From Swiss-Prot:
Manganese-dependent repressor that controls a regulon of oxidative stress resistance and iron-storage proteins. May act as a hydrogen peroxide and organic hydroperoxide sensor. This is Peroxide-responsive repressor PerR. The keyword Acyltransferase does not apply. It comes from the Bacteria. The gene is perR. Keywords: Cytoplasm, DNA-binding, Manganese, Metal-binding, Repressor, Transcription, Transcription regulation, Zinc.
Length: 150
């Protein structure tokens, strides 16, 4: 088994443990949604998850996807990313990280820059706010769109 598959399986097990601890029943659909989120690096929408899973789960609905994503979000194992186009995207990676977003195709890529972790502490110190979190996005054009000449 590849290291990536082992990592996905490990993260899935941890997520299932978090769901069980919260009293959430583990269903095949729930596991499939969670596995898709863990293995996807594209920050999918609920519709994208539905399109990917509906061939294997013909009885699954978009409402089921949204309901499960809400449960995952409430427990803290998924982040909802909202943007101006009114379509929420979902991110399994809930650790502090940032996003760079392609202005042409909408692709979102995670990146982490440790020095930015100090921003919250500095903001709290300078403003005397109780800082709870922050969000930073960088916009540009991805490699694929540059190559296509979009």
């Amino acid at each position: 088994m590849s290291a990536e598959l082992e990592s996905i399986d490990h993260e899935l097990e941890e997520s299932i443990a978090s769901l069980r601890k919260a009293g959430v029943r583990i269903t095949p659909q729930r596991q499939a949604i969670m596995r898709y989120l863990i293995s996807s690096h594209s920050h999918p929408t609920a519709d994208e998850i539905y399109q990917a899973l509906s061939p294997k789960f013909p009885n699954i609905s978009v409402a089921t996807i949204y309901n499960n994503l809400r449960v995952f979000k409430d427990i803290g194992i998924v982040k909802e990313l909202t943007y101006g186009d009114s379509s929420s995207r979902f991110d399994f990676n809930t650790h502090n990280h940032y996003h760079i977003i392609c202005e042409k195709c909408g692709k979102i890529v995670d990146f982490h820059y440790p020095q930015l972790d100090e921003v919250e502490q500095l903001a709290q110190h300078v403003t005397d706010f109780d800082v709870t979190h922050h969000r930073m996005e960088i916009y540009g054009v991805c490699k694929e769109c540059k190559e296509e000449g979009n």
